[in-house]
Amino acid sequence: MINKLKPKSDFSKNIVTLMTGSAIAQAIPILISPILTRIYTPEEFGIFALYMAFISIGASIVTAKYETAILLPKKEENAKYLVYISSIFALFFSLLFFIVYMLFSDKFNNFFKVENDVFYFVPFGIFLFAIYAILLQWANRKKEYKNMNKNRLIQSSSISIFQVLTGILNKISFGLIVSDVMGRVIAVLLILNRVLQQVKLENFSLKKTISLIKRYKKFPKYEMPATVLNITSYELVYIIIPIYFSSVTAGLYFLVFRVLMTPIGFIGSAITEVFKNRAIEDLNKYNSCRRIYKKIFLLLFSIGIFPLLIVTIWGQSIFSFIFGEEWKEAGLYAQILAPLALFRLISSPLSYLFIIKEKLELDLLIQFIFFIFIVISLIIGCFYKDIYLLVSLLSLSGCIFYLIQIIISFRLSNGN
């Protein structure tokens, strides 16, 4: 399958380019994880997981998802306006979150049993996360895949280096969080100047800005809530587990996603960047992108099946050996979540057809149903105080959700 995707075309070259860079970038946090698990405790990982949950959910809200539309306009000027629109939204709502936290910080910290004001970093993390997504969308439109790779690599390595150094040289309970913010700042600054030069507007028109906000209103109306539901479906776990179980349990669960889902996320994201461009081109030209859909499906399945099968069989032994006996429990979670990881890997690029075909209402409905499944799983797991039952239900819900996405996106790949 991989031989069929050797660089015989721009599409194949782009996939190889992005996958190579993504493979290196995702390898860095995984490679340093055995070091971090011996520097930071599961509880500290749990607090970091809570921080990441808030910035992931927040970043999906603050741009109103207008950055997702940057690829779509045929006119370059309209895409430039969308960069400004999504950036203004991101700045405004990030500042709003900061003000709200300043007003209620004590209540917030007490509720989540956090001693230090570590969540002052959350609004900054949200803004950096959102701006970075906007900049990458523009770079993707310009097909600057090598620059995207370079930037991802710098962000990943910067965060990882800071996390190790902070833990060794100046052991603070929120070292993971501070390091994450610093790494994101570096990544944004490196790409920001080039993008600002490319998106300069000779005459800024408020009328046109409002017109484009209305033109792409489906994105805040449907894509934003769908994305929020999808992200919350996973990140809600890190918010609920510390309350009903412990921060230690949240930290163990977080390590599984760091090790298991990070490479899947990077590989899926890399292929998505190229697939969505090729899918748009094929749909415009042939009114169908089923051929490339099938090729990507088989490629992703072949990439994921064997590593995840190994995790399913020997998860506990692998985790205890690599990360230390203290993290053996995380290996059991990994065994349960491995099937979900495979479905997620396959679905993540292919489900972008919901956006390309502007079937955002349908996507929102599916995301809402999935969110309900997750909430029910959390209620049952927390009611019985059984973390294994909870993880099993979360895995099953995710498998069903991604299977539905795959089936529907396959149908969408064939024109109308």
Predicted segments with their positions:
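Helix-loop junctions and terminal segments of transmembrane helices
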Residues: 59-78, 141, 256, 260-285, ...
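Transmembrane helical elements of multi-pass membrane transporters/channels
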Residues: 14-29, 154-155, 159, 175-196, ...
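Membrane-water interface segments that mark the loop-to-transmembrane alpha-helix transition
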Residues: 10-26, 50-51, 56, 60-105, ...
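Hydrophobic alpha-helical transmembrane segments
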Residues: 49, 116-123, 149-199, 257, ...
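Interhelical loop/hinge segments that connect adjacent transmembrane helices in multipass membrane
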Residues: 1-7, 111, 146, 150-151, ...
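Signature of the first transmembrane helix
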Residues: 9-64, 89, 98-102, 125, ...
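Membrane-interface junctions at transmembrane-helix termini in multi-pass inner-membrane proteins
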Residues: 8, 12, 69-78, 128-154, ...
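Interfacial segments at transmembrane-helix termini and the short loops linking adjacent helices
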Residues: 42-46, 105-122, 313-342
